[in-house]
Amino acid sequence: MSALDRALTIEDLKRIARRRVPRQFFDYIDSGAYTEQTYNANEADFKKITFRQRVAVNLENRNLGSTLLGQPVSLPIAIAPVGSTGMTDADGEIKAARAAEKFGIPFTLSTMGICSIEDVAENTTKPFWFQLYVMKDRDFIYRLIDRAKAARCSALVLTMDLQILGQRHKDLRNGLSAPPKFTPRFVAEMAMKPGWAMRMLGTNRRTFRNIAGHVSDAVNLASLTEWTRTQFDLTLNWQDIAWIKKRFDGPVIVKGILDKDDAQLAIDNGADAIVVSNHGGRQLDGAPSSIRVLPEIVDAVGHKTEVLMDGGIRSGQDLLKALALGAKGALVGRIMAFGLGAGGEAGVARALEIVRKETDTSMALMGERDIRNIGLHNIYSNDLDRRQGY
């Protein structure tokens, strides 16, 4: 039995990934901004919610399937956009997209992915989602949207919480870059992770391929990175949703919502769905966890639009808790990344199967047969206050 087969939890996959992935790239997927208060709260706050156990219920013919943006999914989750996924494992975005497609859920490609829109489209058969950062160079954004449309992306995920980069101490200390800088420390680490190194040598996808072809004067990684750093648009506003949606001519999901007033503004300006998110705790440290603010946002706008969430989900039980609090579904990034680091495409598939099994078992023990019926009646009301968090 392989290490992947023996993995029973996402934490098991995380331990395997830590052994296989160079430190700077593992830390990138396993860290938050500043003191990591918000990053840690994302996970910890799920543990404050407890299930109601119901017994003597017919549990035959259970259903985990649902819909996201009107499309059927085998489980109400989607792979969240994660930058530099192709540094966790060679061609990582392609591998994750293939695993998601086989599992029957959407994959979201990041603007800051290593593999390009075209790379993923050429290696999959079903439409995927594309995550967009709004940058100052509007010609670049127009081209990205057009490329996503040409690749038949079925939704655009517009990230609103990165007008300025959060202070991420681990990334700064590690000198994070893609491709990595061959410092003596990094070369020494490669000697201990030969599998990762050999897989990277076997691909030419080792930089930000969505961007590289556009920046003609970026002659090396340093200039490409500097261009990106200066491009995040400080003037981003709610009215930008309209022209982005018009150009894409498809569903736009607004990501980065932590406040009910912002949720309403997103809907007022054309969002087809929203994602309650604090960027995985990698932007404003000290912001509340996503699960804490989810109930009040669902109360405010859940009857008007699909409310998704991300941040802190590490198990099927966490997914059920998010659904109980009113989320239509969840985006999972680190679940994918830990699986990818642990075993490439097979690792992502294993991660998704772990979540499926946890969801099915826990749902049954709660006395439910259909995931679409999960709601507040499945958790103890004294764990939270829907109006003020918990």
Report each predicted region and the residues it spans.
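Glycine- and other small-residue-rich loops at beta-strand/loop junctions that grip anionic moieties
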Residues: 31, 85, 89, 109-110, ...
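Short beta->alpha linker loops
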Residues: 33-34, 111-115, 136, 258, ...
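Alpha/beta enzyme core
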Residues: 98, 123, 139-309, 317-321, ...
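Alpha/beta catalytic cores of nucleotide-metabolism and tRNA/nucleoside-modifying enzymes
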Residues: 1-50, 292-310, 314-390
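Glycine-rich active-site/cofactor-binding loop and its immediate structural neighborhood
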Residues: 73-112
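Short beta-strand segments
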Residues: 80-81, 131-133, 157-161
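A gly/proline- and charged-residue-enriched helix-loop-helix capping module
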Residues: 102-123, 127-141
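An N-cap/entry alpha-helix motif that binds or orients negatively charged groups
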Residues: 1-71, 179-236, 372-374, 380-390
